[in-house]
């Protein structure tokens, strides 16, 4: 589900996907028809369990002037070295995007 508000009262998009082996047993979702340059909230449900709420922002319209933007950068992490504390800091920021240059997890 993708919503316009953090309480998911106004759903902008929703759908169903399968985690496929050819995509690394993960779900790849492309959402169309969202309004430009605004925040949206998303969540996933699988097997009766619901994810925590995530936040994303759509791009401005092409040609729109942007004076500055803030982005996060992260790389490889290791569960035993701190339970992914850097992501907590990234989530608190109003970022335009996050560039992740390495593996998501080592187990």
Stretches with model-predicted labels:
Residues 1-107:
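Divalent metal-dependent phosphoesterase catalytic cores across multiple superfamilies
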């Amino acid at each position: 589900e993708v919503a316009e508000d953090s309480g998911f009262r106004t759903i902008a998009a929703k759908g169903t996907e399968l985690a496929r082996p050819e995509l690394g047993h993960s779900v790849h979702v492309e959402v169309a028809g969202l309004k430009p340059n605004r925040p949206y909230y998303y969540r996933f449900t699988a097997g009766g369990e619901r994810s925590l709420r995530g936040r994303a922002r759509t791009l401005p319209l092409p040609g729109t002037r942007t004076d500055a933007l803030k982005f996060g950068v992260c790389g490889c992490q290791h569960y035993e070295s701190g339970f992914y504390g850097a992501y907590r800091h990234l989530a608190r920021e109003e970022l335009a995007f996050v560039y992740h240059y390495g593996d998501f997890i080592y187990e």
